Structure formats: structure tokens, C-alpha cells
Amino acid sequence: MGTEDCDHEGRSVAAPVEVTALYATDGCVITSSLALLTNCLLGAEPLYIFSYDAYRSDAPNGPTGAPTEQERFEGSRALYRDAGGLNGDSFRVTFCLLGTEVGVTHHPKGRTRPMFVCRFERADDVAVLQDALGRGTPLLPAHVTATLDLEATFALHANIIMALTVAIVHNAPARIGSGSTAPLYEPGESMRSVVGRMSLGQRGLTTLFVHHEARVLGAYRRAYYGSAQSPFWFLSKFGPDEKSLVLAARYYLLQAPRLGGAGATYDLQAVKDICATYAIPHDPRPDTLSAASLTSFAAITRFCCTSQYSRGAAAAGFPLYVERRIAADVRETGALEKFIAHDRSCLRVSDREFITYIYLAHFECFSPPRLATHLRAVTTHDPSPAASTEQPSPLGREAVEQFFRHVRAQLNIREYVKQNVTPRETALAGDAAAAYLRARTYAPAALTPAPAYCGVADSSTKMMGRLAEAERLLVPHGWPAFAPTTPGDDAGGGTAAPQTCGIVKRLLKLAATEQQGTTPPAIAALMQDASVQTPLPVYRITMSPTGQAFAAAARDDWARVTRDARPPEATVVADAAAAPEPGALGRRLTRRICARGPALPPGGLAVGGQMYVNRNEIFNAALAVTNIILDLDIALKEPVPFPRLHEALGHFRRGALAAVQLLFPAARVDPDAYPCYFFKSACRPRAPPVCAGDGPSAGGDDGDGDWFPDAGGPGDEEWEEDTDPMDTTHGPLPDDEAAYLDLLHEQIPAATPSEPDSVVCSCADKIGLRVCLPVPAPYVVHGSLTMRGVARVIQQAVLLDRDFVEAVGSHVKNFLLIDTGVYAHGHSLRLPYFAKIGPDGSACGRLLPVFVIPPACEDVPAFVAAHADPRRFHFHAPPMFSAAPREIRVLHSLGGDYVSFFEKKASRNALEHFGRRETLTEVLGRYDVRPDAGETVEGFASELLGRIVACIEAHFPEHAREYQAVSVRRAVIKDDWVLLQLIPGRGALNQSLSCLRFKHGRASRATARTFLALSVGTNNRLCASLCQQCFATKCDNNRLHTLFTVDAGTPCSRSAPSSTSRPSSS
């Protein structure tokens, strides 16, 4: 029930209407207000009430308790007159200025602060108030003082009067006591005694104001900071249109703090946005007032009080509409949050993809067309809730249909492949099939066990000489000549990166060239052996302690590689009889390998010995792939117990084979019997690594792949099929320098047998794995991009396997498991049974088998022995099916958008909403530069060096001297960027450029490669970026980092100076 007052005769009287009024004066509002409070009318000015809120404290409840929305509207509607002003016999008006009162934490802060309270109860006083509220008539000081409620008013000012009295009258000397209840300000006198003698109320404030006017004014101006606002400030803040000036100002300043709820937490711009969809019909104003003419508070007050939005149903309905609008917004966007929260736990993608997914989800939900549709749906043309014209918004439903439904398809591997993969294959039969396999897979003898090694192996420097000699012999027979590196092309500092790239690609070309008739193959000139058969595997060998070597093998003693990590057949048979369950048998056999602790040769061997310690197969994009070899690098939150890891690998196998069945539909793949071979890098020691942060970069636990922005010599490009050197998920390309080595801090664990249930794996940060899946007959795979697609589909299938995720999900940091950079032409991957070379030159982290036996394996000893068969773990091994197949199918493209649904969606959205992005070729064409013409690109980049050097001088002044005489050499040219290496001049003091990101020790100070990258930025403008690849550990493991980017400017600015001019501000 509402509260009631009683008159002196005991009759019931309704409570007055509560009004909160925001007022202003022509002069200083604080001075005028203090004059009113102290009853000094000479200094008071008339008050303008330009915004107000009204409500009844005795509003009745509905029949079922809390009033309904329509009942609330009717109750508020009864207060606002259609002609302006308020209905009611008496009013309690709280006059406010802008200011903040200290409040409780869980309640929103008020946006206004009350100054005084007046009661308008007599008919004459009510008429004056109605004129002020309905017509904007100024309220005279005499009317304010006549209606002032002294008790309620000075209850508002008691604290500030008390504080001023203590601070001014008693001068607040330094505290000399320490008691919290009775702090002493003078000897023998406590704060309580001081307060007890104070004069509060109107008398106390008047005394202070008369004797200390300046200090009282200053205190009140600080408390009521609204005193400094001008008419222009209010107009610019809440205007400029009439609706927001009236409704948004009233709601934001007065109604939202009173009503509370979500609306009290919305900022002013959000309230103005909601106000824009409150499209209540509005008749033209009878006057000619406009926002530009509101230059005084008198004009603003008259404009606002006579507005149709300040009266009647329009005024009563707006607070209720704000609640409905917020509820509709939250309901529609809540669907987005609900789906994201669900997907956070079940959508197993990499961190980067999940971030892309969140951005895409918000873009799909809040793209301009969808927001426009939503705003049209929530717009109302009638203030009454019962007659509201709002419609259900399709925002959440469309987001689910257009985006989340497709995301759900990613959670089913069959739907994923169906929607995103369109395989393209070519069938070959009979002699054509046999000829293709002979020409595109290793010669059988290369991977057949032999008594001794036969081939060529040498250090990179010597291999360059041998290649040059072989090519000299071949050139008269039509072999393309390799242009020697000219002095001007020298990378400086002894860095032999271009030569190393030349070695790799020239070796791969020689190894893949077929024999023509009776003429020996081209590689015979290198091996000095006319009987050699091609194609041949090419290997990279990390030397100890530094350096690289390369090899091409015609035959090898593979038993020497695997004999100490291969369980005897009798032991396998005995274990299979003792523990026939595949999981338990696999763990037992794996423990036997670990317990034996296979020995590794000491470091410092020659190339012939080192190649049996470390060996990396180099991917040859010209050959067919017969084994899907996956490089897994799993970042861990915590160590994984070996039984759990072994169980997870079983689930990995199942998910991978599910993908293989879908990618190779014509093959017969029995998921319960098909072989899948696992190898794990030996565990790290529990002691901290030897290498410090400034040493050469130590890669991940098993990051064996190679990465380098390819700067190969002439003729390399035609062999660089499907290369993606900017795949930063991969490690750096090897080189002779120690800084480019692929290192790992780990040692072989002690050779002590483990108990059956003990934790064998002690890897705490990362687990490195190699997974080998034979491509099922009758298929082979061709091309780097195709292999990347196969690997990504397999990763998606594995991550959709719930059992795999449950087994290791709590241990894994990032679900980007498979490194696809290893499938680029010229990149290498460490072979099973071989070790890494540590920073001290020692061998560590040998890849040893983990036996995951298929559930329906018919011949366990044969399956275990197959792990040691080199034909099972080489990319281009001769296929295990018939040497003369009736038919083979060459999978040469996966087509579609298998790369990522999110990437596809992002590209489509960018095209739809931001227009077509021009290619780099088109943008460079505006500068008369052709990307395929090396000299023009290098010349144009040289002209841009001036801007780069200017930025370095401004932001890296200590390194500016290094860049005074640099030259530019083309490194890599792709469709969307050009990478050029910056090389110090021959006469420079330092022949290498220093790292700009960190200060390193002397040994690692000059181990950075610096590049200038040209790419297309926003609005199809050409951008020039300075990038560095540093090889110290603290610089993020050899990743290429962009340091800064400058705008190349318009084509007319090609004449930018090439030295030290400042970059343009464009």
C-alpha cells in the first residue's frame, strides 16, 4: 500500500509528487545557490529548470504484487500533462546540479547532487512551479526561499558544513594524537568536543559564508562540478536534436540512477542510440527555435519544457522503452555469448583460429546489415507498451543460421570434408602408372638395407664445389648453368644462406632427374657412379658443434641406424603371448625400448659418422608422397603420464584414419588393422637447459622443420613448387652458422627399467612426435599444398575425436598440433631413429618408436618390425603395393577451402564489406614496377630505404649507423608480398646487422637477418615494413617479426630520397 500523510484534523492526504529538477542560472549557479541557502536574496538569481523527473512514492502495486509494465506506464502517464507540467496537488522538488555523491559499491553512482529541497503545497506556489515546468518560466528566488524545506535541505549539507568548520574555523592543525576514536587537534581537545560546539544548519553555513566566502565557494564548486558547464556544453553533450536533448538527458541524469537496472550502467552514447529508435510521432514545433539558437539557459529551458517529448505519453513511455530495448539487445546478443561459451570448451582449434572465430562471430552478429535489420525490428512508434510496434529481432537467429550452423559442421569430420574439401585426382593405369612411380618415387635400392653406404655426403662448403664441378660436366649436355654468386651478392658476415639454398635446390633437382635411355642420370656426375638409379633421397645433416652437411644416398646400411632400438622378434612374440591386449602390449614394448637406453655416438664426428647421428629428409615437391609424415609439436601445461599419452595416441590414430578414409575414398582402409607408426623424441632432462637466452636459438622440443625466406640463386624458382616460406609455424632453414641450427635441450633418460604403471614421459613443456601413415593403395599424393591440406584435415579429424581431447585436453596449451611448414620444397624433417644436435655439440632427443598396435593387428611382430623399415618413414619412398600396379590415383589437389572455415569466412566478409583488395602486382604497377623483374623491384626498394632509415634514426638511434650503407637484394617474391634482404656494404665496420628488438651478448649481437617487405595495406595502399629474423632464444625462436611499417605514399612520391629523409606522414 502507498504511504499517506494526515492533516491536523486527521484526514488522509496523498503523498506529494516527487520531482527531481536539474536547474541552472544565468550567472554563477553556486554563488546563487549559496545565497538562497543563507537567505541572502540580493545575490540570488532566478532558476531555470531545464530537465526534471517525476514519480510518486506511493505508487500502488498491481493485483498480483509488482505492477506490470502497462500499469507502470499508466501510472507515469497520469503524472505528465499533455499541455506541459505535472498533475498533482502538492510537490516535493529536489533541486540538483551535476555532481557525484560517494555511495555504496554495489549501487550505481548518482550523476547529480541535490542542493536544496522545496515543498510546493499552496495553490499559488503550485501554479508558479507548473509555469516553470510547462513553459520554462524562471523560478524567482522569493518562491524558492518561501517553499524551502530547511530540515531536509540542511540534512544534505551537514557533512560539508562540518568539514568546512573544522578546516576553516579550527585551522585543522597537524594531528598529534593517535587514538582513532578521539584524535587530538589541540592539547586536551578531541574532535568530538570540536564537533559538539559547531553551529550546523542555515546558521552555521551563513556564518561560514559571511566570514570565509572564497573558501566556501571553492569547496562547493569542487563538490558541484556542474557549475562550470555552459549552455553550449549541455547542448553538445546531450543534443543536438530535440529528442535526445530532452529524453536522453532526462533519462541519463535523473531517471536511470533512480530506476537502477541495466540502464543505469549504460553510458550516454548508448542511451542516445536507444533514443534514436524511439520513433514517436512528433508534430512540428510552433516556434522557430533550433539548436543553433540555444545560446542561454533561458533558451534551453524554454525549448526543453515546451517540447512534446517532455510531456504526455512520450515522456512517460521512454524509460520503459529503454528497458525493453536493452532486454531485446541482450536477448539477441546473448545467443552469441552462449554459443561462444559452448564452443570454447568443444571447438578444438589453435589459439589463433579461436581468436579469429570470436572476431568473426561478433562480425556476423553485428555487421552493418544485420544491425540495421535489428534496429528496424526494435524501433517503436507508440509509447504505450500495449500498443508497441516492436517486432522480434532476427539478429540471434540469423547469426546462428549463417555462422554457427556452419561452425557446427566443423565439429563433424564428414560434414567438414563434404563442405570444405573437393579432392582432385588423376587416374593412371598400366605402363603409365608404373612409369610414374619409377619417375616420382625413390629408387627401391635407395631404401633397401645394404652392407654399406653408397652416395655423396659432404659439408656445405665442399658440397658447393662438388656441385659446381658436376654442373660443369653437365652443361655441355643441356644442363642449366648455375650462376655463381657475384661479389655484390655476398650476404656479408660469412652468412652462406643463398649458397645453402642453392645447395638444397640443386641437389633436389639432380636427385629427381630421370635417366634418359642408356645415359646415366645427371646425379651420376656428382656421385661418380654411372650405375646409380634415381630418384634419390637428399638429406641435411647437422654437424657438431656447428655447421651443415648434405647427402644424397643411393644405398645405405639401415640396420646400423635401427638395430639398437628394435626389440627382438622373440621378445615381441613372448610379450604378445603374455599381454595380448593391444594397449598393454604396446606400452610394454615401448618401455623395453626406453629401458634399453639406445646409445648415441659422441659428438665431433666427420660427415660420414655424423650422418648416422642426425639426418633430415629434404622434401622434394617434384616427387610423389607415399607416406603421410606428420610433425607434431605439442605444447604442454603439465607433463602427461605415459599411459595417458599412449591412450591418446590410439585415439589420434583413429581420428587420422577417419580422415584418410574420407580423403582417399577409393582405397580400402580398415581402421582396426591399418598401420600407423609413432615415434617420440626422447624426454628432456628435469634440469634446466644449458643454453641461456642470448645463445643461438633452441627450437621447440621437436621443431625439426626448416624455414628461411628463400633467397636462392638463379634457377631455384622453377623448382620451388608450392613453397610457402612465410609459414611462420615452422623453424628456420639450416645454414652453416650456429645461429641457424635446430637445437634442443634434452638428454636421453637414464636406462633404468620402469614399473608397468610408472610415468615414463617426463616432458614438461613440449612433446615432439613423428607420425607415419602410408598413403593407402592405389593413391599417391603430389604437391606441397596438397600435403598441407591432408595434414590440416587430419588435424581437424583428430581434434574432433572426443576421446583424444578428453585424454590430453587438460594437459595441452594449444591445439595447433601439426606443423604443415615441413611440406615446402627444400624444407627438411628429422627422420625417426635420429637425434638432434645440442648447443654443446652433443646428440639428444632421439626419435624412438612408440608402439600403438592396431586393435585387429594380425601379425604383431611384423607390425613392430615395420617401424624400422625406412620405406615407412620417408616422404617419397617407393610404395609398398605392387611394383607394377594396374592403376594408381594421383591426388594433386584438395581444392575447396579446407584450409579453414574461419579463414574462408573472413576473406568473404572482407570482400563483401570492404571491397576487393588489389594484388601486389596491381599496386606496384602504379609505380611502374614489375614484381617479376628483380632489378626494378630492388631499385624501387632502394628508393624507399630513406624512409626506413629515417624511422631507425628516430626510434633506434644507436643502430642508425649500421643502415647508412645498406643495399637491397631480392629474397622471395609471392603473390601478396615481396621480401628483400638488407645487406651491409662491404666497407661497413660490421658485416651483419644487429637485432633491434633486444640487446644480446657479444656472441649473439649480430645474428639477425633484416628484410624489407612490400605488401598491400588498407585502402589498397603500398606498405613497406622492416622485418627481422633474429636467432637468439629470447627473440622467439627465429620467427620473422615486423618492427614497423611505413606508407610508401602515392605513386608521385617515388622520388623520395634514398638516404636519411624523414618518412612522410601519409
Curated annotation (Swiss-Prot):
Its EC number is 2.7.7.-. GO terms for molecular function: DNA-directed RNA polymerase activity; zinc ion binding. One of its GO terms (cellular component) is host cell nucleus. It comes from the Viruses. One of its GO terms (biological process) is bidirectional double-stranded viral DNA replication. The keyword Zinc-finger applies. The record marks D631, D633 as: Essential for primase activity. Residues 715-725 have a biased composition (Acidic residues). InterPro entries: HSV_PRIM. A zinc finger (CHC2-type) spans 995-1035. Belongs to the herpesviridae DNA primase family. Essential component of the helicase/primase complex. Unwinds the DNA at the replication forks and generates single-stranded DNA for both leading and lagging strand synthesis. The primase initiates primer synthesis and thereby produces large amount of short RNA primers on the lagging strand that the polymerase elongates using dNTPs. This is DNA primase. It comes from Human herpesvirus 2 (strain HG52) (HHV-2).
